[in-house]
A protein has these predicted regions:
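Phosphate/dinucleotide-binding and metal-coordinating scaffold of catalytic cores
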Residues: 1-320, 324-420
Length: 420
């Protein structure tokens, strides 16, 4: 049986700006199918004896460890890998190279995608090398992260890339592959650097959009801020007639310092696609915060208000990848809110609210308030405040984002819970 092994050296940069060797990731390739195992570095374990675990499949002990159940790769490394947009860019680039070199395109495996992400903009604080004395991967010192002034060019590149069905436009790939490969999701996007050295995610219009998605995400983002929820800095810019570009500041960076981020999918031991259909529930997030949160009271209140807010705007894409945690010196904290969008025909969330029901229903949210250590009286008051804030401001914010009256009427059903 044909087999070969790839050894990847894993580092973390969340305890200091100096990278610390975390351990070794072993990737076994048997007839084009990869399997993974990981072993912590002994010195890292000694220095981290009382540290929080980074993945439920990677407990803090010596020796090889393997993903559990049907998982092929540890969630810790899945969070560092690109999602659909980044994978599409890498796959298209391989096709171009194969065409130029007169060969068949190589099938890219999970480890290729993992190592293909540009290190400078990689999400979180986990980093990778193939040689301990070599660079962190992927490395490209000749072309730094694009500056803010390149946004218009990047939006044009993303549009040309989407419209290029043959996949042979080399120049668009070159402009997008590095700033876009580090990010999750399916939408065209890129990471850019502002004049103060802060990283931002730019989400561009897509040819598949039926509405101005960027403008509506900005509306929802600002509504969340008005409701007192934790959201990063954001802005909206129009570069073309095709739609708005929504920009949000990366919360996994503090200047040059990296902050470790883990999705709820990883920390709850879930696989991609986990949803209400398999019983995945907000109550699991509640349990994780109670057991592992550094500020459980604050985070439980924030999480519960997010449930009500998601209902108020009919955000039906609130799956486990769209919830996350950041690791600080004192432990795990609920990450800022991200990727919230209104859906006019939405009537169920992606996750169950209680154990088995995902219906957009204020009664359901109130039912689980005690699990979040919120009294019935306080929950009713908080819910009323969220709904009133959405009801009183969604039209105004939509107009400020340049959305027409007809666009607002089309999206009105998304806010029906608040408008009742």
């Amino acid at each position: 049986m044909a087999s070969n092994q790839k050894i990847i050296y894993v580092y973390e940069s969340f305890r200091s700006t100096t990278p610390n060797y975390l351990g070794t990731l072993f990737v076994e390739n048997v007839r084009g199918r990869e399997s993974y195992s990981f072993e912590y570095d002994a010195d890292w374990l000694k220095s981290s004896a009382n540290y929080m675990y980074l993945d439920p499949d990677l407990q803090l002990y010596a020796g090889r460890q393997y993903p559990s159940g049907a998982k092929n790769v540890f969630g810790l490394f899945a969070d560092s890998s690109p999602d659909r947009w980044g994978r599409l860019l890498m796959t298209r680039r391989e096709r171009i190279l194969a065409e130029q070199e007169g060969r068949k395109p190589r099938k890219l495996l999970d480890s290729d995608f993992l190592l293909g992400v540009y290190d400078e903009t990689r999400m979180g604080a986990i980093r990778f090398k193939l040689d301990k004395d070599g660079p962190f991967l992927s490395d490209d010192s000749e072309t730094p992260t694009p500056p803010w002034t390149s946004l218009r060019t990047l939006e044009e590149a993303s549009r040309q890339f989407e419209n290029d069905e043959s996949g042979l436009e080399q120049k668009w790939i070159n402009q997008l592959i590095k700033p876009g490969s580090s990010l999750g999701g399916a939408r065209p996007k890129a990471t850019v650097l502002d004049t103060k050295g802060n990283l931002w995610i730019a989400k561009f219009p897509s040819k598949h959009d039926d509405v101005n998605v960027g403008a509506w995400e900005k509306v929802t983002h600002d509504l969340a801020r008005l409701c007192g929820l934790d959201v990063p800095e954001s802005m909206l810019i129009d570069f073309s007639k095709y739609g708005s570009t929504f920009l949000v500041r990366r919360f996994d960076r503090n200047g040059a310092a990296r902050i470790h981020f883990a999705s709820a999918m990883t920390m709850l031991g879930k696989t991609d696609g986990a949803s209400a259909a398999d019983g995945s529930s907000y109550l699991e997030l509640v349990s994780f915060i109670k057991a592992n949160g550094a500020a459980p009271k604050r985070d439980l209140t924030e999480l519960w208000k997010r449930i009500v807010f998601n209902m108020a705007v009919s955000d039906t894409d609130d799956h486990m990848r769209n919830h996350g945690f950041i690791l600080k010196a004192d432990g795990w904290h609920l990450s800022p809110l991200y990727d919230v969008n209104p859906v006019p025909e939405g009537d169920e969330l992606s996750l169950c609210v209680n154990e088995d029901d995902a219906t957009i229903s204020l009664d359901l949210a109130l039912e689980i308030a005690p699990y979040c250590e919120i009294s019935t009286k306080d929950a009713a008051a908080m819910a009323a405040d969220v709904l009133k804030t959405v009801r009183d401001n969604w039209n105004r914010l939509a107009a400020e984002c340049g959305l027409s009256r007809s666009a607002q009427e089309y999206m009105r059903p998304a806010f029906s819970l608040a408008l009742e």
